Amino acid sequence: MKHIISLMLENEPGALSRVVGLFSARGYNIESLTVAPTEDLSLSRMTIQTHGSDDVIEQITKHLNRLIEVVKVVDLTEGAYTERELMLVKVRAVGKEREEMKRMADIFRGRIIDVTEKSYTLELTGDVSKNDAFLEAID
Protein backbone atom coordinates (compact mmCIF):
# COMPACT_ATOMS: atom_id res chain seq x y z
CA MET A 1 0.00 0.00 0.00
CA LYS A 2 1.24 3.49 -0.88
CA HIS A 3 2.04 5.80 2.02
CA ILE A 4 3.05 9.46 2.13
CA ILE A 5 5.15 10.34 5.16
CA SER A 6 5.86 13.93 6.16
CA LEU A 7 8.84 14.81 8.36
CA MET A 8 9.94 17.98 10.05
CA LEU A 9 13.68 17.85 10.59
CA GLU A 10 16.52 20.15 11.47
CA ASN A 11 17.80 22.04 8.44
CA GLU A 12 21.45 21.04 8.68
CA PRO A 13 24.04 19.30 6.48
CA GLY A 14 23.73 15.52 6.50
CA ALA A 15 20.12 15.31 7.75
CA LEU A 16 18.77 14.22 4.35
CA SER A 17 21.58 11.71 4.02
CA ARG A 18 20.76 10.11 7.37
CA VAL A 19 17.07 9.73 6.50
CA VAL A 20 17.83 8.24 3.08
CA GLY A 21 20.50 6.03 4.64
CA LEU A 22 17.95 4.68 7.12
CA PHE A 23 15.66 3.65 4.25
CA SER A 24 18.54 2.11 2.32
CA ALA A 25 20.00 0.19 5.27
CA ARG A 26 16.66 -1.42 6.07
CA GLY A 27 15.72 -2.20 2.46
CA TYR A 28 12.84 0.28 2.23
CA ASN A 29 12.25 1.96 -1.12
CA ILE A 30 11.69 5.70 -1.57
CA GLU A 31 9.48 6.27 -4.62
CA SER A 32 9.32 10.04 -4.34
CA LEU A 33 11.17 12.56 -2.20
CA THR A 34 10.71 16.30 -1.74
CA VAL A 35 12.63 18.51 0.69
CA ALA A 36 12.29 22.25 1.30
CA PRO A 37 12.93 24.72 4.13
CA THR A 38 9.97 25.93 6.20
CA GLU A 39 9.18 29.46 7.37
CA ASP A 40 11.38 28.61 10.36
CA LEU A 41 14.71 28.41 8.52
CA SER A 42 16.10 26.04 11.16
CA LEU A 43 13.64 23.34 9.98
CA SER A 44 12.95 21.55 6.70
CA ARG A 45 9.90 19.61 5.60
CA MET A 46 10.56 16.30 3.89
CA THR A 47 7.80 14.41 2.09
CA ILE A 48 8.48 10.76 1.24
CA GLN A 49 6.31 8.43 -0.81
CA THR A 50 6.93 4.74 -0.13
CA HIS A 51 5.11 1.39 -0.26
CA GLY A 52 4.57 -1.08 2.53
CA SER A 53 2.11 -2.77 4.82
CA ASP A 54 0.87 -0.93 7.88
CA ASP A 55 3.41 -2.88 9.97
CA VAL A 56 6.30 -1.83 7.70
CA ILE A 57 5.19 1.82 7.77
CA GLU A 58 4.96 1.66 11.56
CA GLN A 59 8.55 0.37 11.68
CA ILE A 60 9.71 3.12 9.30
CA THR A 61 8.01 5.74 11.49
CA LYS A 62 9.63 4.36 14.65
CA HIS A 63 13.09 4.34 13.03
CA LEU A 64 12.63 7.91 11.73
CA ASN A 65 11.58 9.15 15.17
CA ARG A 66 14.86 7.80 16.59
CA LEU A 67 16.96 10.05 14.36
CA ILE A 68 18.23 13.06 16.31
CA GLU A 69 17.48 15.54 13.49
CA VAL A 70 13.84 14.45 13.12
CA VAL A 71 11.41 16.69 15.02
CA LYS A 72 8.07 15.22 13.86
CA VAL A 73 6.83 12.32 11.68
CA VAL A 74 3.28 12.12 10.26
CA ASP A 75 1.80 9.46 7.94
CA LEU A 76 -0.37 11.69 5.72
CA THR A 77 -2.10 8.67 4.24
CA GLU A 78 -4.17 8.39 7.42
CA GLY A 79 -6.05 11.63 6.67
CA ALA A 80 -7.45 13.54 3.72
CA TYR A 81 -4.83 14.93 1.34
CA THR A 82 -4.47 16.19 -2.21
CA GLU A 83 -1.84 14.63 -4.42
CA ARG A 84 -0.44 16.36 -7.50
CA GLU A 85 2.42 15.47 -9.79
CA LEU A 86 4.65 17.85 -11.72
CA MET A 87 6.06 16.45 -14.95
CA LEU A 88 8.64 17.99 -17.27
CA VAL A 89 8.82 16.30 -20.67
CA LYS A 90 11.18 17.06 -23.53
CA VAL A 91 9.55 16.05 -26.82
CA ARG A 92 10.71 16.03 -30.41
CA ALA A 93 8.97 18.80 -32.33
CA VAL A 94 9.97 19.23 -35.97
CA GLY A 95 7.78 20.38 -38.86
CA LYS A 96 4.13 19.33 -38.44
CA GLU A 97 4.94 17.86 -35.02
CA ARG A 98 5.37 21.38 -33.60
CA GLU A 99 1.71 22.32 -34.05
CA GLU A 100 0.58 18.88 -32.85
CA MET A 101 2.65 19.21 -29.66
CA LYS A 102 1.25 22.71 -29.03
CA ARG A 103 -2.26 21.29 -29.45
CA MET A 104 -1.54 18.37 -27.09
CA ALA A 105 -0.09 20.75 -24.49
CA ASP A 106 -3.27 22.86 -24.69
CA ILE A 107 -5.57 19.83 -24.41
CA PHE A 108 -3.79 18.65 -21.25
CA ARG A 109 -3.41 22.22 -19.91
CA GLY A 110 0.35 22.03 -20.09
CA ARG A 111 2.81 24.82 -20.79
CA ILE A 112 5.70 24.96 -23.21
CA ILE A 113 8.59 26.19 -21.07
CA ASP A 114 11.47 25.79 -23.53
CA VAL A 115 11.76 25.76 -27.30
CA THR A 116 14.63 24.67 -29.54
CA GLU A 117 14.79 24.01 -33.28
CA LYS A 118 13.97 20.35 -32.75
CA SER A 119 12.16 20.09 -29.42
CA TYR A 120 9.78 21.52 -26.84
CA THR A 121 10.03 21.09 -23.09
CA LEU A 122 6.55 20.83 -21.60
CA GLU A 123 5.38 21.28 -18.02
CA LEU A 124 2.27 19.41 -16.90
CA THR A 125 0.70 19.34 -13.46
CA GLY A 126 -2.08 17.04 -12.34
CA ASP A 127 -2.84 13.66 -10.93
CA VAL A 128 -0.81 10.66 -12.01
CA SER A 129 -3.51 9.36 -14.38
CA LYS A 130 -3.67 12.68 -16.27
CA ASN A 131 0.08 12.80 -16.77
CA ASP A 132 0.17 9.13 -17.79
CA ALA A 133 -2.62 9.80 -20.31
CA PHE A 134 -0.55 12.62 -21.81
CA LEU A 135 2.45 10.32 -22.22
CA GLU A 136 0.27 7.69 -23.91
CA ALA A 137 -1.28 10.31 -26.21
CA ILE A 138 2.08 11.53 -27.50
CA ASP A 139 3.59 8.05 -27.82
Please describe what each predicted stretch is.
Residues 1-139:
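A conserved regulatory-domain signal marking ACT and ACT-like small-molecule sensing domains
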